């Protein structure tokens, strides 16, 4: 029970930790997106003054700038709350300034867990399995004890008694002794029905404990397989999101170049910037998802430390 509670605390703390890392990276992303929009806003303003862009183009960009500022504010507020939650879980004062080890990393270190696993590891480490195995053994012994209480019992007794004077001749002042040997047999004739009932009840309890153990093993096997599947799925999503981000960056680069050359409209640049923001955000989510699925797999195996 202590081991299971400790793993729950570790998992909650890890979740809060990576939530902070996610929001730190999304804050950087929101700041970069806002900077892009502000730069585009300045370029469009110059083009309006030169008569090669309309006020509608300028208004469209300013709306995006305002939206980006609001998004940045929301991310900052969420980051502050996430830091407070992490402090609370770690027993630190909520107002304490903390800097996490992975905050300044460009790419989060990933795939430290092998998705291949041995179910025997989970059976050995999961506390609920150990508890149910112990309960099964106890109920099996209870059957033996209950059966023994209602089986015939035989007792052999013997003693040797020495007296002076002798019990055979009271006038003889000598030590004389004799042996006493007896056999006692106890057969539960009147309570045999009660014994059968109690034995059957004990066997039923033992079978229930065995079924509970089997059910727990099956559920843990399902849980571990689901966690391993999610690890693999998260890895695939990360690969796809990385490719998508590369394409979005290339698209934004061509859109920005075309805009400066005057062959691409402002709306196309805004679309490219939005796609760039979405691709980066998806990659951050995919990286964090990989870390969290690794944690869930370790917990399902009982190896989370």
Predicted regions and their residues:
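Small/polar (Gly/Ser/Thr/Ala-rich) solvent-exposed segments
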Residues: 1-4, 130, 140, 149-179, ...
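Periplasmic alpha-helical coiled-coil/stalk elements that build and connect Gram-negative outer-membrane
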Residues: 2, 8-121, 227-230, 234, ...
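Amphipathic alpha-helical coiled-coil segments
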Residues: 5-28, 46, 82, 131-146, ...
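Metallo-beta-lactamase
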Residues: 75, 127, 209, 286
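Residues on the lipid-exposed face of transmembrane beta-strands in outer-membrane beta-barrel proteins
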Residues: 86, 183-187, 286, 297
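Acidic, glycine-rich loop-and-beta core segments that form the ion-binding/anion-interacting portion
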Residues: 108-109, 114-155, 159
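Hydrophobic, lipid-facing positions within transmembrane beta-strands of outer-membrane proteins
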Residues: 118, 179-185
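Short cytosolic juxtamembrane segments of multi-pass membrane proteins
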Residues: 152, 299-305
């Amino acid at each position: 029970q202590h081991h299971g509670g400790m793993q729950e605390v570790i998992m909650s703390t890890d979740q809060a930790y990576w939530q902070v890392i996610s929001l730190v990276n999304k804050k950087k992303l929101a700041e970069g997106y806002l900077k892009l929009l502000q730069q585009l806003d300045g370029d469009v303003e110059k083009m309006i003054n030169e008569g090669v862009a309309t006020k509608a183009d300028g208004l469209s960009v300013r709306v995006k700038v305002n939206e980006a500022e609001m998004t940045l504010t929301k991310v900052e507020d969420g980051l502050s709350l996430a830091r407070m939650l992490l402090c609370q879980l770690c027993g630190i004062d909520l107002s304490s300034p903390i800097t996490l080890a992975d905050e300044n990393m460009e790419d989060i270190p990933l795939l430290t867990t092998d998705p291949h696993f041995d179910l025997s590891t989970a059976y050995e480490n999961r506390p609920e399995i150990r508890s149910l195995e112990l309960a099964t053994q106890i109920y099996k012994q209870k059957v033996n004890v209950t059966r023994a209480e209602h089986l015939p019992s035989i007792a052999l007794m013997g003693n040797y008694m020495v007296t002076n004077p002798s019990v055979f001749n009271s006038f003889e002042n000598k030590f004389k002794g004799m042996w006493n040997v007896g056999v006692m047999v106890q057969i539960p004739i009147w309570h045999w029905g009660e014994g059968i009932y109690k034995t059957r009840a004990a066997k039923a309890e033992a079978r229930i404990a065995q079924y509970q153990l089997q059910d727990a093993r099956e559920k843990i096997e399902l849980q571990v397989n689901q966690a391993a599947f999610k690890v693999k799925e998260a890895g695939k999503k990360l690969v796809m999101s990385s490719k998508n981000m590369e394409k979005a960056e290339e698209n934004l680069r061509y859109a920005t170049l075309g805009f400066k050359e005057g062959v691409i409209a402002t709306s196309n640049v805004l679309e490219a910037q939005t796609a760039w923001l979405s691709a980066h955000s998806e990659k951050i989510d995919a990286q964090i998802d990989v870390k969290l699925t690794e944690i869930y797999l370790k917990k399902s195996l009982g190896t989370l430390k």
